[in-house]
Amino acid sequence: MKKIAIRIDDIGASAKRFEVYSKRRIGNFLFLKYLKPLKAWGPYREMVAGEWGQVFKILHRYGAKLTVGVTASWVEWNGKLVPFPEKFPDEAAALKEGLGQGILEIANHGLTHCVIGKHLPRLFFSNRKYHREFWDWIPRQTHFMHIKQSQEILQDYFETPIITLIPPGNVYSSDTLEAANYYGIKTV
């Protein structure tokens, strides 16, 4: 029998709210990026606890396991960080239940998913490049700080070692890999 493994990212990521861009360059002007014919991405909502229950039923039915990339903190408009379990307590509890059932792996999807201070929608262009947390132009100490803090939040709440990192947008650098290794991550 073959095993099925699947992955979902952006759980708890404020990129859902703030990363907005158009399919066309002209579409990034003012409000146009929000219009359905031009919109390529964002905003979209967080899955709610009841929806996770439906996902769990499907996973059990097919003997599948889901890797869930959780962004450890939501970034508010003002740049304040709110840990995922505080911002979304019901959803966090649902994920903890799925972890306990052995059908989920919780993966680190970064602390913020974005470059703080540059995460808000722009009037005249896309903000897409600022919704990747581990660019090579981000200072080394930021990579280490973000991996450390996200590991602490996720491991404290889920009470299990977090050994997988899914970098937002699959963007990472050698600093990211060093930080991940230092804080116990085995798979990127």
Where are these regions (language model features)?
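Catalytic alpha-helical scaffold of carbohydrate-active enzymes acting on polysaccharides/glycoconjugates
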Residues: M1-I163, N170-V188
